[in-house]
Swiss-Prot record:
Amino acids binding S-adenosyl-L-methionine: G184, E185, S216, S238, L239, H240, N317
Gene name of the encoded protein: rlmN
Protein name: Dual-specificity RNA methyltransferase RlmN
A GO molecular function held by the record: 4 iron, 4 sulfur cluster binding
Keywords, alphabetical: 4Fe-4S, Cytoplasm, Disulfide bond, Iron, Iron-sulfur, Metal-binding, Methyltransferase, rRNA processing, S-adenosyl-L-methionine, Transferase, tRNA processing
Lineage: Bacteria, Pseudomonadati, Pseudomonadota, Gammaproteobacteria, Pasteurellales
Length: 390
């Protein structure tokens, strides 16, 4: 049985002694939705119509889908729904950034809209909390609760689009880029992140260029090696340290997949990817007198000498009880200059939304069950969240 058929069988199976649960059509890619319509005895092209209604027009009410006959609309209402996360809290920054706390079940995740002169980027979460325990990141301090479903991931894009007027309202810049850089490690939720990204790329849905959809990872190497077999999108690596000793400390997944192992995997991805222009983005948070010295810049240049890349230097954004300080502008500028002398393209990222805790590393959300991280430690050892990915 093919993956789509297996998925549909799972979605359509109902226990005889339990009420039927409606299928959330946002959990389905267009191909899976075509299988769904076949199961209903309908023509598969109806899926194309539904996907357009949901994502092109932002419609979640079957009755408003005027090119679908009433009989089919009634059938759909009986077995399916279109449901995206609702906004629990909205905060607007003085710089135009908007942060939403999106309600997903009993928990919340955070989604950030960042408008700029030539683009508008949406930062999307992939998990409730995060299990990787990066010491400089607010989300990691909240612990891990669960993976988000496809509908909870793509639903963030849908809800944000609905709010900002991405469905044809003039005067508002639409979402041009999506970055999987919100709460969570995307490569620990590949089963749901990849289908959500497929919907982002689908011309019947959002039709984003694969160069405008970016997946950021701290380095789950087996999943990264598999990613190119599933989808081609832009790649960003959360490196943050130029040597294993330091990275073991601040990005604990490095204890399982060290820098060389990670960079080798990145190079393999670049060799087969068309989405990256032959270059990967390296993310490097600047921590005062921790990883921002001249010696660190030289070490980083050595690590990346055979990897075509653009380096983003990220001024660290503080959160309560964090054991770090933000690097001074002088130290950041000196770090940048040193790397540029090696010929690297190095950009100092402008901090956006820090007045509403929407900046990089500040997303925390409302993680209710904080015991999951402890359970993962017991199951997988101290290398939290570095389980094998088949």
């Amino acid at each position: 049985m093919c993956n789509n058929e297996a998925k549909m069988s799972e979605l359509l199976s109902v226990q005889s002694d339990a009420p039927a649960k409606k299928i959330n059509l946002m959990d389905l890619t267009r191909q899976q939705m075509r299988e769904f319509f076949k199961e209903l005895g309908e023509k598969p092209f109806r899926a194309d119509q539904l996907v357009k209604w949901i994502y092109h027009f932002g419609e979640d009410n079957f009755d408003n889908m005027t090119n679908i006959n009433k009989k089919l609309r009634e059938k759909l209402k009986a077995v399916a729904e279109i449901k995206a996360p609702e906004v629990a809290v909205e905060q607007r920054s003085a710089d135009g950034t908007i942060k939403w706390a999106m309600q997903v079940g009993e928990q919340q995740v955070e989604t950030v809209y960042i408008p700029e002169a030539d683009r508008a980027t949406l930062c999307v979460s992939s998990q409730v909390g995060c299990a990787l325990a990066c010491t400089f990141c607010s989300t990691a301090q909240q612990g891990f609760n669960r993976n988000l479903t496809v509908s909870e991931i793509i639903g963030q894009v849908w809800r944000a689009s609905k709010i900002i007027g991405n469905f044809g309202v003039t005067g508002v810049r639409p979402i041009t880029n999506v970055v999987m850089m919100g709460m969570g490690e995307p490569l620990l939720n590949v089963a749901n992140v990849v289908p959500a990204m497929e919907i982002m790329l689908d011309d019947f849905a959002y039709g984003l260029s694969k160069r405008r959809v970016t997946l950021s990872t701290s380095g789950v190497v087996p999943a990264l090696d598999n990613l190119s077999k599933m989808i081609d999108v832009a790649l960003a690596i959360s490196l943050h340290a130029p040597n294993d000793e330091l990275r073991d400390e601040i990005v604990p997944i490095n204890k399982k997949y060290n820098i060389k192992t990670l960079i080798d995997s990145v190079n393999r991805y670049l060799n087969v990817s068309n989405a990256n222009h032959g270059k990967v983005t390296i993310e490097y948070v600047m921590l005062d007198h921790v990883n921002d010295g001249i010696e660190h810049a030289h070490q980083l240049a050595e690590v990346l000498k055979n990897t075509p890349c653009k380096i983003n230097l990220i001024p660290w954004n503080p959160f309560p009880e964090a054991p770090y300080a933000k690097s001074s502008n002088t130290r950041i500028d000196r770090f940048q200059k040193t790397l540029m002398e090696y010929g690297f393209t190095v950009i100092i990222r402008k901090t956006r939304g820090d007045d509403i805790d929407a900046a990089c590393g500040q997303l925390a959300g409302d993680v209710i069950d904080r015991t999951k991280r402890t359970a993962m430690k017991r199951q997988f050892g101290q290398n939290i969240g570095v389980t094998e990915v088949n």
